[in-house]
Amino acid sequence: MPKQKRRYCIAIDLKSYFASVECVERGLDPLTTNLVVADLSRTEKAICLAVSPSLKAYGISGRARLFEVVERVKQVNAERQRNAPRRQFVGRSHLDPELKANPALALDYIVAPPRMGKYRQLSTEIYRVYLKYIAPEDIHVYSIDEVMMDVTNYLEIYHMTARELAMTMICLLYTSDAAD
């Protein structure tokens, strides 16, 4: 039996994709901005479509209901207030670095309404970046923000490791060339 060639795959899952899009659209860092994507026109029982990583760090799940976010933020703020100078807040912030630097700030967050059309459009642009390097038959799309790519046949062509190829594609996403 012939020896099978070793396969190399790249899995890309865009971190908190909807929340990240909303942060970037606002000129905010997706990793340090407290933001949820949810429809405020519904009740607080509405499920958040996304929660930013910094807000998840406070124990809020990625698919929390809005009332759970409200309740958890109240709990966090009660604890922060106990530890604040004179047990008083001097303001609020949705930015994690500010909250870490100033215990007298209350935890706040942005509620962004969902924009599915925008998320699909950006997902298409991201997919086009992948297509600059990988043929569509080697890209398996799992969801709007997840792909698995078989890059075995491309490593020799590009003279890269799988990690280098992944980083090349990811870096291209951060440049203005991504949508070209």
Show which residues each predicted segment covers.
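Gly/Gly-Pro- and Ser/Thr-rich, intrinsically disordered tail segments characteristic of DNA damage-repair
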Residues: 1-176
